[in-house]
A protein has these predicted regions:
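Hydrophobic alpha-helical connector segments
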Residues: 72, 86-116, 162, 166-169
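Hydrophobic/aromatic residues within well-ordered alpha-helical segments
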Residues: 66, 77-81, 92, 96, ...
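Alpha-helical DNA-contacting segments of helix-turn-helix folds
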Residues: 70-77, 84
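N-terminal intrinsically disordered/low-complexity leader segments
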Residues: 1-22, 29, 204-207
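Amphipathic, non-transmembrane alpha-helical scaffold segments
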Residues: 28, 74, 78, 136-144
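Amphipathic alpha-helical segments used for helix-helix packing
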Residues: 98-99, 113-134
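Hydrophobic/aromatic-rich alpha-helical bundle segments in the mid-to-C-terminal region
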Residues: 4, 134-141, 155-207
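Helix-turn-helix
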Residues: 2-3, 26, 30-68, 72
Length: 207
């Protein structure tokens, strides 16, 4: 019997720190779904904890504020975006146009699905015009990096003005994010890959 007590004690000690982690994961998942669907400003802390089935103190033990939770959501969104973007590009080594087309072809499919609300980072930048807001900071950093990546890809394609082509591609992508929320299936977002090819070919002097 005496030998069971230490084992039981160890198990209890090991389980204790897992509880807030599980609560934090549930809060994070719930917040992501609600923030993306309804917008960050529209979703209150009470709604998040009710949906997640946790208490408000549980939320504040893991996240100091709703603003911090919003920033975490956007960092997760950023990581998911780059995971998808990089996978498309990596599938076409040495051919940046094909890699970009692969990403945009996937976007054109996602953009017409039910529940698609565009880019969570673009939406956050619109919701939070304040320059120093944590959500806007993450959104701006992401878009700056996307702009840089597109210009670098344009240079690899041999564009005479990589920055100009990169900016054109960025405008196309952002247009797809926004127009998808207006038109849905059959909207212009479905053509984003074809439009990108036309833009690239024009910049490279192809007929």
């Amino acid at each position: 019997m005496a030998s069971k007590s230490p084992a039981g004690g160890k198990k209890a000690a090991a389980d204790t720190p897992a509880k807030p982690l599980l609560a934090a994961d549930g809060i994070r998942k719930t917040a992501r779904e609600m923030f993306y669907r309804d917008g960050i400003r529209a979703v209150g802390v009470d709604a998040i904890v009710n949906q997640a089935g946790v208490t408000k103190p549980s939320l504040y033990r893991s996240f100091s504020s709703k603003d911090e939770l919003a920033a975490v959501y956007l960092r997760d969104y950023d990581a998911e975006f780059w995971g998808r973007f990089n996978a498309a590009c990596d599938a076409h080594p040495g051919d940046p146009q094909a890699g970009l087309r692969a990403y945009l072809s996937g976007l054109s499919v996602r953009a017409v699905q039910n529940g698609y609300r565009g880019c969570g980072l673009t939406n956050a930048a619109v919701e939070y015009p304040e320059a120093g807001h944590p959500a806007r900071v993450v959104a701006v950093e992401h878009k700056v990096e996307l702009r840089r990546r597109l210009a670098a890809m344009a240079a690899e394609m041999g564009a005479p003005d990589p920055a100009k082509l990169g900016d054109g591609l960025l405008l196309l992508i952002e247009g797809a994010f926004v127009s998808s929320q207006l038109f849905g299936e059959g909207g212009p977002a479905a053509r984003v890959a074809d439009m990108a090819d036309l833009l690239i070919d024009a910049h490279l002097g192809r007929r």
